[in-house]
């Protein structure tokens, strides 16, 4: 069953990969006589639905194989997040018929699946504190809310790619290009992790955690930074330049540093090849979009995703926390950043509805909101130690 689950996920990845250039063709094509999307868009959304059902097949079969909802580690949560992102896109596509939304959303879904595959994919039993029905109630609802909110990010990027003047450098082009750099860095992380994995690189360290207990940590990349009071056990491997405090996971911080460095190299190479900003390269893909429609999509995504996220990430989370740890709130890093996410999107809705922050301002807010979600998913989950930290 676990092997079947992996096959379903692989099939979903391939179908999404095929759908992306088809949506690209739909953007360049003309609409039919009644103003509806052309046949390429229809093929693209059909493939998206097929890919989603493959993705759903992965989710169901992995659930059957593990005996619990597959959202208990970084691989499972990120793939589930990608599945819900595609579901949110399909629903909004049928409401707004916007092919460019498919091009960019499916590209993000592909990155999420590839990113997830860099983490251990083995099925493992749940620890006692997670053996509760609230696991899939809390986590899946929060993931669905985040996925719908992510659509507002996609709409915001589409809006900014068309609206921001690419003919001259400015603060707007700088920050828009920063988004492109982060996406390139994600690709670099996938590439460099795969390369070291294929090379079979491993280095073991003894280290002391924040509870002052000794344990072993395995690095899969050369150690630029080491764990707290780390001692290298594997001969012939690189000694770290500096040890980190016990608050941080040395292996994960090391991975972040390697990924950032590889991202700089890859981004620099791309700029040398294309001889323009990546955002300027993507501009022709959105030149025909209706900015008012894209702005509406972004707002609707937040208005739908915000209450779902609030229900899953805060209300259900507090109920489960009370049942598991006899307290509703503990100021765990993940709890704090869930609250920050809630407050940010509440401010987004307030500024849009009360202060008239439409268009470009709304698009930038959507981008910042997604950055907070990704910070919570990647940095808080992986780098900071806490009750919610994924191994």
UniProtKB/Swiss-Prot annotation:
Record-level GO BP terms: cytochrome complex assembly
Gene Ontology CC annotations of this record: membrane raft; plasma membrane
Keyword Zinc among UniProt keywords: no
Keywords: Cell membrane, Cytochrome c-type biogenesis, Membrane, Transmembrane, Transmembrane helix
Compartment(s) where it occurs, according to its Swiss-Prot or TrEMBL record: Cell membrane; Membrane raft
A GO MF term: heme binding
UniProt cross-references to InterPro entries, sorted A to Z: Cyt_c_assembly (IPR002541), Cyt_c_biogenesis_CcsA (IPR017562), Cyt_c_biogenesis_CcsA/CcmC (IPR045062)
Transmembrane segments: 7-27, 40-60, 75-95, 101-121, 141-161, 173-193, 254-274, 301-321, 328-348, 364-384
Pfam families membership: Cytochrom_C_asm
Main localization category: membrane
Summary of the knockout phenotype: Cells lacking this gene exhibit a lack of cytochromes c but normal contents of cytochrome a and b. Can sporulate.
Membrane topology: Multi-pass membrane protein
Keyword Protein biosynthesis recorded: no
NCBIfam families, alphabetized: cytochr_II_ccsB
Free-text function comment from the UniProt entry: Required for the biogenesis of c-type cytochromes.
Family, as annotated: Belongs to the CcmF/CycK/Ccl1/NrfE/CcsA family.
Subunit structure and binding partners: Interacts with FloT.
Record's protein name: Cytochrome c biogenesis protein ResC
Gene: resC
């Amino acid at each position: 069953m676990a092997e079947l689950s992996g096959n379903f996920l692989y099939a979903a990845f391939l179908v999404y990969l095929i759908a992306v250039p088809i949506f690209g063709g739909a953007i360049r094509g003309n609409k039919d006589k009644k103003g509806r999307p052309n046949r390429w868009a229809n093929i693209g959304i059909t493939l998206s639905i097929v890919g989603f059902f493959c993705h759903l097949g992965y989710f169901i079969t992995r659930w059957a194989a593990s005996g619990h909802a597959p959202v208990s580690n970084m691989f499972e949560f990120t793939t589930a997040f990608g599945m819900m992102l595609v579901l949110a896109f399909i629903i909004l596509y049928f409401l707004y018929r916007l092919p460019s939304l498919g091009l960019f959303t499916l590209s993000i879904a592909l990155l999420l699946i590839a990113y997830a595959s860099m983490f251990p994919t083995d099925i493992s039993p749940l620890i006692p504190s997670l053996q509760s029905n609230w696991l899939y109630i809390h986590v899946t609802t929060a993931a669905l809310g985040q996925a719908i909110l992510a659509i507002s990010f996609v709409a915001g990027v589409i809006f900014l790619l068309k609206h921001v003047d690419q003919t001259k450098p400015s603060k707007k082009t700088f920050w828009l290009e920063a988004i492109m750099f982060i996406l390139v860095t994600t690709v670099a992380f996938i590439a460099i992790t795969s390369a070291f994995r294929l090379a079979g690189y491993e280095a073991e360290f003894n280290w002391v955690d924040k509870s002052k207990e000794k344990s072993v940590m395995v690095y899969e990349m050369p150690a630029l930074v080491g764990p707290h009071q780390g001692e290298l056990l594997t001969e012939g491997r690189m000694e770290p330049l500096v040890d980190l405090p016990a608050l941080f996971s040395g292996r994960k911080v090391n991975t972040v540093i390697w990924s950032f460095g590889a991202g700089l190299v890859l981004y620099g190479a791309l700029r040398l090849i294309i001889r323009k900003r990546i955002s300027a390269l993507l501009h022709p893909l959105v030149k025909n979009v209706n900015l008012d429609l894209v702005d509406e999509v972004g707002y609707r995504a937040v208005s739908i995703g915000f209450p779902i996220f609030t229900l899953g990430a805060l209300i259900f989370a507090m109920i489960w926390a009370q049942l598991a740890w006899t307290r509703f709130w503990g100021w765990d890093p993940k709890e704090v950043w869930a609250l920050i996410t809630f407050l940010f999107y509440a401010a987004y809705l307030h500024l849009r509805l009360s202060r008239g922050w439409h268009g470009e301002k709304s698009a930038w807010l959507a981008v910042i909101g997604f950055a907070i979600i990704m910070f919570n998913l990647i940095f808080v989950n992986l780098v900071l130690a806490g009750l919610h930290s994924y191994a």
